[in-house]
Amino acid sequence: MIRTDAKDGALVLFSGGQDSATCVAWALERYQTVETLGFDYGQRHRVELECREGVREALKHRFPAWSDRLGDDHMIDLSVLGAISDTAMTRTIEIETTANGLPNTFVPGRNLMFMTIAAAIAYRRGLRVLVGGMCETDFSGYPDCRDDTMKALQVALNLGMDTRMVLETPLMWLDKAQTWQLAEQLGGEALVELIRVETHTCYVGERAELHDWGFGCGECPACKLRKRGYEAYLKGERVTEAPL
């Protein structure tokens, strides 16, 4: 397909979770065109993908100013990533810390593949900005979520595609309480409530019970951090250490 001229638009990595939903709202406040991109890689918590359309529709209907800006959604089958991964995100195994100090929820190469595919789609669609919810403040230590990684990837992608794309990571230095706060700043209590009810974070895919902070098992690291972040947000506090 012929490449279109670069426009005031962004492509957001959107999993259906809290962080990426916040990033979609962040982009909608800044760019005239916002498209979304999801990946089905055989994740254990595949229910998050089922939340994506509900979040998109809610954003359109509850925030009229954003409705015309929210463009196409793209879903990519990346089952090969799940096939080559042996992690707690792609296998039904206990979540634990590995010998290298990383949790076994780390999927090697995941964000590198996500951003590379996103860049190829953005190139074709004429979108200049890629947006991801990576951050260094969630205590996971994932190397492909680090600021240095994203900066290096931006350089590599632009060299390899002869473009001037920008990789934006608006949550990079925000803790989970500040992520809730950002949602409030972007869309008020209505956006906070949308994210609380419509998004999914739980690693094990539990979506049977709605807690104060959202759906989830309440026991996995993702649920504990989301819960702690929501509680800290309500109290005006920060999340300075990993919840137990």
UniProtKB/Swiss-Prot annotation:
Cofactor binding note from Swiss-Prot or TrEMBL: Binds 1 zinc ion per subunit.
Positions contributing to ATP binding: F14, S15, G16, G17, Q18, D19, S20, A21, T22, C23, V24
EC number(s) from the headed UniProt entry: 6.3.4.20
Pfam families, per the entry: QueC
Pathway(s) served: Purine metabolism; 7-cyano-7-deazaguanine biosynthesis
Keyword Ion transport in annotation: no
Entry-linked SUPFAM superfamilies: Adenine nucleotide alpha hydrolases-like (SSF52402)
Disulfide bonds: none
PANTHER family: 7-CYANO-7-DEAZAGUANINE SYNTHASE (PTHR42914:SF1)
Function recorded in the entry: Catalyzes the ATP-dependent conversion of 7-carboxy-7-deazaguanine (CDG) to 7-cyano-7-deazaguanine (preQ(0)).
Recorded family membership: Belongs to the QueC family.
Name of the featured protein: 7-cyano-7-deazaguanine synthase
